[in-house]
Amino acid sequence: MIVSYARVVSTVSVICVALLWTVTASGQAAQAARLTPADYIEIRQLVARYAYAVDTGADNGNVYASLFAPDGAFADRMGRETKGRDALAALARRNTRGPQSAIHFIVNHVIEPTSEGAVGKEYLLQLRIGEGERPNDIFGGGHYEDVYVKTPDGWRFKRRQFIPSEGGPRPSRDAAAR
């Protein structure tokens, strides 16, 4: 059987193009799943700003809402989801009563890149500020599970879920193994 040189070159060219496309596509996916040092810092700042916003109710809840993507959502301890900035600002207003009475300590932040942005987990301890004879005390805690997206305004929460430590699910073991 005689095979023409042109047919061999054509077949090899098709195979090379297919391999090049596969390598390029997988390289782009791997590159998309990377975060820069600046990304890590910005995401940590987002979480720190969240603690201040939720504790103080800054700007009538609007600072809290601005930390979420326009279609972002927060899921509370019961799994109820509040979605969209207007609803999130209203949630922050409802949950802030008078002078600051609690402080969120958000610690042990783990951030992992994804093809869409990043995910994160961190622990929460809530300190209740004492009044009169009542001393300060830790009155709650749990952990957050976050989905972050990069927007034109910087990193924002796409979704944030609070899971209480009392009887709630534990953080997944996958995150601890990384």
Locate the predicted segments by residue:
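N-terminal secretory signal peptides that target proteins for export/translocation
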Residues: 1-7
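Active-site micro-motifs of SAM-dependent methyltransferase domains
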Residues: 52, 74, 162
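Bacterial N-terminal signal peptides
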Residues: 10-24
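A solvent-exposed, acidic/Ser-Thr-rich amphipathic alpha-helical stretch
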Residues: 60-125
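Generic alpha-helical structural signal
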Residues: 44, 48, 86-89, 142
